[in-house]
């Protein structure tokens, strides 16, 4: 968005999340942090990085969210964004030479260019287990963890998964 504005383009962003940060707005489980050093997560925009100081080379989700909030405060990108908005259709009109975009809440937009930024983490995967419907406990997914946390102390907890989120949760759950 920042580069598009600098190029004189008018743009709009539709994002299913509540604010900037993508996966770092959804993944707020205990122990969630980057597994690559911060330069990979930092924008190469002097206005943003000149007033920002990381507390660690491997920040957690809270610091990343604060960074994205700082970025928005400096660049004022959210004025052209619609958060909590799911795009449900995008069709190219050959005659008009534009994209017709529709959202879940009924909004329509037209655009000469369409950039889809739905990465591998855009859709949660919850495997089906036999008798899962009979389980009487609570089930949480790491990418939809409540920000206020989950009181799991003193309870028997099963963590299913071998990726970064599973490993990070195991480290802080004992």
Specify the residue positions occupied by each region the protein language model found.
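Conserved beta-strand scaffold positions in the cores of enzyme catalytic domains, especially
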Residues: 13, 81-82, 137-140
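Gly/Ala-rich phosphate-binding loop of Rossmann-like dinucleotide-binding domains
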Residues: 1, 5-6, 170, 174
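Short beta-strand "acidic-cap" motif of Rossmann-like dinucleotide-binding folds
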Residues: 8-16, 24
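Feature captures the FAD/FMN-dependent oxidoreductase FAD-binding
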Residues: 55-121
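Glycine-rich, phosphate-binding/catalytic loops in enzymes
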Residues: 5-7, 29-30, 131-134
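Glycine-rich dinucleotide-binding loop and its adjacent helix/turn
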Residues: 48-54, 60-63, 118-173
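Glycine-rich active-site loop/strand segments that organize a redox cofactor
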Residues: 18-21, 25-67
């Amino acid at each position: 968005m920042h580069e598009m504005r600098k190029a004189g383009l008018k743009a709009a962003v539709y994002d299913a999340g509540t604010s900037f940060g993508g996966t770092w707005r959804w993944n707020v489980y205990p122990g969630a942090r980057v597994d690559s050093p911060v330069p990979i997560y930092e924008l190469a925009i002097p206005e943003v990085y000149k007033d920002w100081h990381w507390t660690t080379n491997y920040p957690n989700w809270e610091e990343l969210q604060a960074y994205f909030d700082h970025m928005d405060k400096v660049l004022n990108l959210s004025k052209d964004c619609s958060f909590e908005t799911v795009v449900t259709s995008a069709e190219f009109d050959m005659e008009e030479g534009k994209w017709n975009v529709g959202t879940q809440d009924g909004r329509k937009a037209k655009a000469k260019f369409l950039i889809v930024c739905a990465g591998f983490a855009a859709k949660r995967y919850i495997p089906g287990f036999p008798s899962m419907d009979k389980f009487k406990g609570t089930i949480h997914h790491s990418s939809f963890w409540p920000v206020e946390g989950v009181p799991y102390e003193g309870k028997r907890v099963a963590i299913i998964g071998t990726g970064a989120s599973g490993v990070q949760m195991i480290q802080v759950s004992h």
